[in-house]
């Protein structure tokens, strides 16, 4: 599991 939340790149 990644520590950073999965955000979609703009």
Curated annotation (Swiss-Prot):
Pathway: Energy metabolism; oxidative phosphorylation. Heart specific isoform. One of its GO terms (cellular component) is mitochondrial inner membrane. It is found in: Mitochondrion inner membrane. The keyword Mitochondrion applies. Keywords: Membrane, Mitochondrion, Mitochondrion inner membrane. One of its GO terms (biological process) is oxidative phosphorylation. It comes from the Eukaryota. It is a single-pass membrane protein. The keyword Mitochondrion applies. Belongs to the cytochrome c oxidase VIII family. Component of the cytochrome c oxidase, the last enzyme in the mitochondrial electron transport chain which drives oxidative phosphorylation. The respiratory chain contains 3 multisubunit complexes succinate dehydrogenase (complex II, CII), ubiquinol-cytochrome c oxidoreductase (cytochrome b-c1 complex, complex III, CIII) and cytochrome c oxidase (complex IV, CIV), that cooperate to transfer electrons derived from NADH and succinate to molecular oxygen, creating an electrochemical gradient over the inner membrane that drives transmembrane transport and the ATP synthase. Component of the cytochrome c oxidase (complex IV, CIV), a multisubunit enzyme composed of 14 subunits. The complex is composed of a catalytic core of 3 subunits MT-CO1, MT-CO2 and MT-CO3, encoded in the mitochondrial DNA, and 11 supernumerary subunits COX4I, COX5A, COX5B, COX6A, COX6B, COX6C, COX7A, COX7B, COX7C, COX8 and NDUFA4, which are encoded in the nuclear genome. This is Cytochrome c oxidase subunit 8B, mitochondrial.
